[in-house]
């Protein structure tokens, strides 16, 4: 009974309406937070997952040891790797393809890699006109790694305490 009386008083006084109207007015006069892209950009987290890249060691040798863990863990089956042994007994990839159309950008490939060879870099602007351009081969992935290496290394360093 008491609950119904309280509800009737609130309804008659329009307290819910007044509260909602006050909140709307607060946001109406608050400073705008619109970012005019591409002239302005929001800060990006070091853990941001963008365009894929294959990294190299400072000596120029590619990091990938062809363990195929990234291919095995990929839930979308977007990664295809072929490898062959080298003269020194180590393995290196002869083919490393990522179908970016299938990729769900989950980051599992990056987490599985024991040598930090495959990473998801900071690049967000890789739109294309055709689907075929989204099939990345080894050369394109290595070019991405070379282009973004400084920023990728910095982001991995910032993320190191959480790994």
Curated annotation (Swiss-Prot):
**Source taxon at top rank:** Bacteria
Q: Which PANTHER family match?
A: NADH DEHYDROGENASE [UBIQUINONE] IRON-SULFUR PROTEIN 8, MITOCHONDRIAL, NADH DEHYDROGENASE UBIQUINONE IRON-SULFUR PROTEIN 8, MITOCHONDRIAL
The protein's Enzyme Commission number:
7.1.1.-
A GO biological-process term: aerobic respiration
Q: Which reaction does it catalyse?
A: a quinone + NADH + 5 H(+)(in) = a quinol + NAD(+) + 4 H(+)(out)
> Which gene produces this protein?
nuoI
From which source organism is this entry? Answer: Caulobacter vibrioides (strain ATCC 19089 / CIP 103742 / CB 15) (Caulobacter crescentus)
Give binding positions for [4Fe-4S] cluster 2.
Answer: 74, 103, 106, 109
Protein name as annotated: NADH-quinone oxidoreductase subunit I
Any one cellular-component term (Gene Ontology):
plasma membrane
In the bilayer, the protein is annotated as:
Peripheral membrane protein
Name the SUPFAM superfamilies for this protein.
4Fe-4S ferredoxins
Q: What does this protein do?
A: NDH-1 shuttles electrons from NADH, via FMN and iron-sulfur (Fe-S) centers, to quinones in the respiratory chain. The immediate electron acceptor for the enzyme in this species is believed to be ubiquinone. Couples the redox reaction to proton translocation (for every two electrons transferred, four hydrogen ions are translocated across the cytoplasmic membrane), and thus conserves the redox energy in a proton gradient.
Subunit text: NDH-1 is composed of 14 different subunits. Subunits NuoA, H, J, K, L, M, N constitute the membrane sector of the complex.
What UniProt keywords are attached to this protein's entry?
A: 4Fe-4S, Cell inner membrane, Cell membrane, Iron, Iron-sulfur, Membrane, Metal-binding, NAD, Quinone, Repeat, Translocase, Ubiquinone
Q: Which family does it belong to?
A: Belongs to the complex I 23 kDa subunit family.
InterPro entries per the record? 4Fe4S_Fe-S-bd, 4Fe4S_Fe_S_CS, NADH_quinone_OxRdtase_chainI
Compartments it resides in: Cell inner membrane
Q: For this protein, what does the record note about how its cofactor is bound?
A: Binds 2 [4Fe-4S] clusters per subunit.
* A UniProt-annotated Pfam family: Fer4_7
Where would one find coiled-coil regions in this protein?
none
What's an example of a GO molecular-function annotation for this chain?
A: iron ion binding
Q: What positions does the entry give for [4Fe-4S] cluster 1 binding? A: 64, 67, 70, 113
Provide the cofactor list for this protein.
[4Fe-4S] cluster
Q: Which residues form the 4Fe-4S ferredoxin-type domain?
A: 55-84, 94-123
């Amino acid at each position: 009974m008491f609950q119904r009386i309280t509800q009737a008083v609130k309804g008659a006084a329009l307290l819910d309406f007044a509260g909602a109207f006050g909140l709307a007015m607060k946001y109406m006069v608050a400073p705008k937070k619109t970012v005019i892209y591409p002239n302005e950009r929001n800060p990006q987290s070091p853990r941001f997952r963008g365009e894929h890249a294959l990294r190299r060691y400072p000596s120029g040798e590619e990091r990938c040891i062809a363990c195929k863990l990234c291919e095995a863990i990929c839930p979308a089956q977007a990664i295809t790797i072929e490898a062959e042994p080298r003269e020194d007994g180590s393995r290196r990839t002869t083919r490393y393809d990522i179908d970016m159309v299938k990729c769900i950008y989950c980051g599992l490939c990056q987490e599985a890699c024991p040598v930090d060879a495959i990473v998801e870099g900071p690049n967000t602007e890789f739109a294309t006109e055709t689907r075929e351009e989204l099939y990345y081969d080894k050369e394109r992935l290595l070019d991405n790694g070379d282009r973004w290496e400084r920023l990728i290394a910095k982001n991995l360093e910032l993320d190191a305490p959480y790994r």
